[in-house]
Each structure stands twice: as structure tokens, then as C-alpha cells.
Amino acid sequence: MPELPEVEVTRRGIEPFVAGRRVERVDVRTAMLRWPVPADFAEMLRSREVLGVERRGKYLLFEVDAGWFIVHLGMTGTLRVLPNDAPPPAPAKHDHVDWVFDEFVLRFRDPRRFGAVLWHPRDAGDVRAHPLLASLGVEPFSAAFSGALLFKRTRGRTVSVKQALLAGDIVVGVGNIYASESLFRAGIRPTTAAGRVSLPRYERLADAVRATLADAIERGGSTLRDFVGSNGESGYFQLDCFVYDRAGEPCRVCGAPIRQIVQGQRSTYYCPNCQR
């Protein structure tokens, strides 16, 4: 599933193409995604200029004068920029939406159809008040994210610290890979109760989250199965993981075998020596 780094890589790849350009038309081939694409979506965007592209959590927010169209990649979604100087590749089975510009096509592909393409009109208020966005946690690269915030929001909580990171109500975008990697960098065992982690350890964890996500963005995200960036290239962060998907292999720091457990129906990886 694309997480914050993969979505940010996509945003950075797309924005230079679309910002300041007008959508000539929208071709919706499959309206039944995770939620239905609005019936008048294509008409609403015809000839609209894209003012910019932002990211909130794992959502991409494309601003036009009349509002925002929101794209979520779901589990298997990608957005590709395809040149339009010659006929672009014919849409394949899982190519659901095309935004056609004068020189290129922005194509949304999603084999499992858990992604979404939605509309938020400007007269409904700021897009961040949209029901899907309003309750999200803080952005990990914002000034609001800190060890103090993690410490405050987890007092009295018995859920594991890894599950607290994944929940998304404190901080967004720390998916399964990045939670395991961040906890390793911070030296915190993922099974530790969130409410029992001290402030100094949470300060280390906040720094580790930022560093892990920044490294992942720099490497183009992680490609475990389907993800490619807007240029069609795979990400490479998974090749440098300290613990994720390395069960039984030696820790890159101490040499102890990496362990794998299941938490909340998801695999967790950690070093029993480096993480306490």
C-alpha cells in the first residue's frame, strides 16, 4: 500500500507538469472505485486550471479555482504522466481515469480499485475540513510533530507503540514498513505499551520517524509489489531497510537475527538486541 513517502514522491513528480496547466477533458472509464467518482466530475473539471498539488497524509489534493479534486492511491494505485505528443498508450483494464492536458495525460491506474477520486467544492470550505481529512493526525514534517506530542497523546494507552504509530490519529503517514524502521532507529521494541514509553525515547522516535520518511522519499519510496512513481520508476528504500522483511537475517548493527511477529494482522520486524 502506498504510504506517505510514495504519495509524496508521486506529488513531486506530478506537480511540475500540472501546475498552471488546464485540464482539456477528463475520461472516467470506471466510476466505481472505493467511493463512486462523482457523475459530473468530468464536466466540473473541463478547462479548469490546476493551481497546485498538495499532500495531506496519503491524499493528493489538486486545487482548481472551483475547488479540489482528491486522489487516494488505495492499495495498488498509481498516477503516471504520459506524453501526449503522440497517442499515449491505449488504456488497459485497470486504467480508470485520465486527465487530458495539451501535452500529456495524467492516468490513474488501480488494479484492486481501493483508491478514490473525489471532489470538494470551494463553497464547502477548505479541503482540509473534508470528512476524510478532518480527523487526521499531524504531518510528520510539520512543527506540530514532536516527541512531546507523542508522549502527551499516549498517556494511559496500553496499545503497542507500533500500533499507536500506525493508527494515524497522532501522526499521519507512518505505515507498516516505516513504523518498523523508525522504531529500530529509535531503539524501541515495537511491542512496548505506548503509555510506557518515556519522553526522551519519544523524542528519539520523532527524530527517527522524520529521518526514515525523508530517506524513503529520497530513494523514491518503497516498491514491494505495485508502486511506481509518476515516471514509471520503482522505489528503492526497501533495499536499505534495517529490519523490515529481513526475518532471520543478521542485524546490520549488532548481527543478531532479526525477528518477525504479527501485530494487528500485520508483520512486525525488530532486533531483539538493539530494541528494548
UniProtKB/Swiss-Prot annotation:
Disulfide bonds: none
Family matches, as InterPro entries: DNA_glyclase/AP_lyase_DNA-bd (IPR015886), DNA_glyclase_Znf_dom_DNA_BS (IPR015887), Formamido-pyr_DNA_Glyclase (IPR020629), FPG_cat (IPR012319), MutM-like_N-ter (IPR035937), Ribosomal_uS13-like_H2TH (IPR010979), Znf_DNA_glyclase/AP_lyase (IPR000214), Znf_FPG/IleRS (IPR010663)
EC number: 3.2.2.23, 4.2.99.18
Chain ranges of zinc fingers (FPG-type): 242-276
Cofactor binding comment, as recorded: Binds 1 zinc ion per subunit.
Subunit text: Monomer.
Protein name: Formamidopyrimidine-DNA glycosylase
Originating species: Burkholderia thailandensis (strain ATCC 700388 / DSM 13276 / CCUG 48851 / CIP 106301 / E264)
Taxonomic path: Bacteria, Pseudomonadati, Pseudomonadota, Betaproteobacteria, Burkholderiales
